[in-house]
Amino acid sequence: MCAIIHFGTDGWRARVDGDFTINNVARVTDAIGRLWQKTNPGKTVYVGFDTRPQACEFAELAAGVIAAHGLDAVLVSRPVPTPALTWAAAYDGEACGALMVTGSHHPQGYLCLKLRMGDGSTANQDVIEELEETMAAEPLGLEGQYRTADIIPDYMRAVASFVDADAIRAAHMRVVVDPMGGAAQGYLADLLRELGVEVHEIHADETTDRGDICPDPVEPWVDACERAVVEDGACAGLVTDGDADRIGAVDERGRYIHPHQIMALVLGDLVQYRNLKGRVVVNLSCSTLVRRIAEALGCRVVIKPVGFKYIAAEMKKGGVLVGGEEAGGIGIAAHMPERDGILACLILCELMAKTGAPLGVLIDQLEASFGKTSYGRRDLRLEAEDAETLRTLLPGVNPKSICGKAPQSVSHM
């Protein structure tokens, strides 16, 4: 019996010892290939993979299936960050999209298929529903010829050109970089070294598929980075998740900086140092800190449901400056309508260079101006049917008080 495949907020995820099998990957990529050949016949599709075991093998399978549908499938020649693959598709006029095989920020044993459209955005709900509805029950055994390419050099030049290289070089900074064994290893560290930054890279030359670390840039998984920053006397620790579309950070005192604070700093850099304007798009779960700062900087805030695909859809309308989710994904519209953890790290370095202040001082200044905020998150793992039941029940849950205080509002977005 074939598995029922449902896409989540950012692609299809399953355990390698469960539903993430050769047959199911072939089924998903067959549906993608048929869709794109119908809407974009003969166009280019980039296929990438990260450092997880078997990611490369599944990417080779996917590229062959995509090519069998008459599309120009391009398989990357080495592990790449998802933002690099997305950028390659977005800036290739002949490309209709990209497909990434990655463990992303998920624990050991998981792999995902992330789908990106030709403009770099996450696939919208209409595309997802068509894929799910037209997916074959069994793989068709299709395999075509694909080509390979190294997309990294062009991507590295592009993100480096986005920041003020002279300011960063003049600052003579020291940072710790933690790619968490993921796809950014070597790339972010090398970029910063080329910009004159002294870098201590940890969790490099490793895989994210290990039991002692989850490649999610939050506590407790950033503990090693926190220690390294203090021991090295660095001005910051820069952390990316398994496929480098999310960012985490540590200040010079070894304190974890939550994603809302990072987005606030990035927003400040874009407005105050680049004189850029536009709407700021955030998920419902994003902190009020970002909203306060955006309004103070004269930017209108747009709130969307959880899932970056909703933010990307708003970015594609135009007039958006930046979009961010509470999990550390930050997308800058002038770059592409998708998250890029590597670019976000470079912008933090640029901000520290221009202000002459380490990360902790910048956060202290934020809190002095806009108040101190706290944020906590607890994930709950549910089976698909249980999650659907919860979605049905939640609209009827409207608490009159929480910890003795009345909620200002309740949203079921």
What are these regions (language model features)?
Residues 34, 44-110, 191-250:
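N-terminal small/polar loop signature for handling phosphorylated ligands or for N-terminal nucleophile
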Residues 1-2, 19, 111-232:
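Gly/Ser/Thr-enriched, mixed-charge loops and adjacent short helices
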Residues 115-118, 248-252, 332-333:
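Short beta-strand-to-turn element immediately C-terminal to the catalytic PLP-Schiff-base lysine
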Residues 77, 130-157, 252-324, 331-332:
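Proline/glycine-rich low-complexity loops and linkers
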Residues 236, 276-413:
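Phosphate-binding and adjacent anionic-ligand microenvironments
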Residues 1-69, 145-175:
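An N-terminal, well-structured beta->alpha segment
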Residues 124, 201-203, 255-274, 341-350:
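Gly/Ser/Thr-rich active-site loops/lids in small-molecule metabolic enzymes
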